[in-house]
Amino acid sequence: MKISLVVPVFNEEDTIPIFYKTVREFNELKEYEIEIVFINDGSKDATESIINKIAASDPLVIPLSFTRNFGKEPALFAGLDHATGDAVIPIDVDLQDPIEVIPHLIEKWQAGADMVLAKRSDRSTDGRMKRKTAEWFYKLHNKISNPKIEENVGDFRLMSRAVVENIKQMPERNLFMKGVLSWVGGKTDVVKYARAERVAGDSKFNGWKLWNLALEGITSFSTFPLRIWTYIGLFIAGMSFLYGAWMIIDKLIFGNNVPGYPSLLVSVLFLGGVQLIGIGILGEYIGRIYIETKQRPKYILKRKGFKSEI
C-alpha cells in the first residue's frame, strides 16, 4: 500500500533533512510504501539542491520545483497532481504536524473514511493573536459560506485516491484549499492531536499572507459580501426617506429652519465612504473573475525529477 506525503517547502533548507530522516526512521510507517512529494515553491536558499540530492538516492521521493513563488495553495495542488499513492496526506515540513499522527489517519481511512481530518486540540505553540484571529475567521467563514470548514483543521489530513481525483478536476485558479477539500465531500472522520513546535527555522507565513488567504477563503465560497450591500443600500435609502420626511414636517409644522451645509456635507461624505467600501468589495470579486477568465495555469514547473518541464 502506497501513502503519499505532499510537502510544500519555501526556504526550508534547515528543516527538510530533519523531516526526511524522521519519516524514514519512523517504525510505524515502515509497513507502507511512503512516497514523499516535495514542492519547492521558488525558494532562494539551498532547498532545491537538498531535495534533488535526497531524490537521487531515494526513488520514492518526487522533487518538484516552481519557476517562481506561486504560493502554498498552488504548491499543494501541484503535490496532489503528482502524488501516486492510494491515499495522500498534505503535511508541513516543520513537523509541527507530528509524524506520529499519520498511522492514526491511515487507521481511520482503512476503516472506511474518504477523508480523515487532523484537528488541533492544542494550539499553544501559536501566538495568542494568531489563535484569536483564526477563531474569528472560522466563525465568520462558517456563518456566511458554504460548505463549512472544520475549526482548527489545517491542510494536514488524509484523502483517499477518489477524493484526490475529484479535487484534480476543479479548474479554478484562485485556490483556497481548505474550502476545496471540504467542498468535495465524502465520508469524513477526525483525529485530534496537539501541535508541536517547529523543529528548525521560522515560519514563512506572515500576517499579510494570512489576511490574503482569509479574503480568498471568503470570496471563493460566499457571495454574502456582495449581497449585504443590497441590504445596506435599502437601509440607507429608508433612513434618507425618513430624514427627508422629518425635515419637511419640521419646517411646515414647527417652522424650524432646516440645517443646510453641515447636514449635506455629512450625508455626502457618509454615502461616499459607503460607496467606496462597496466598490472595493465588488472589485475583489471582479478581480477574481478576471484572473479566472485568463485561464493561466495554477503553477509552472521548472523541474519534475531532473527534467525541465512547463
Curated annotation (Swiss-Prot):
Family: Belongs to the glycosyltransferase 2 family. GtrB subfamily.
Single GO MF descriptor: glycosyltransferase activity
Function: Involved in O antigen modification. Catalyzes the transfer of the glucose residue from UDP-glucose to a lipid carrier.
EC assignment: 2.4.1.-
Coiled coil: none
Cross-referenced SUPFAM superfamilies: Nucleotide-diphospho-sugar transferases
Subcellular location: Host membrane
TM stretches of this protein: 229-249, 263-283
Gene: gtrB
Any one of the GO CC terms: host cell membrane
Descriptive protein name: Bactoprenol glucosyl transferase
Enzyme kind, highest EC tier: transferase
Primary localization: host cell
Membrane topology annotation: Multi-pass membrane protein
Keywords: Glycosyltransferase, Host membrane, Membrane, Transferase, Transmembrane, Transmembrane helix
Organism: Salmonella phage P22
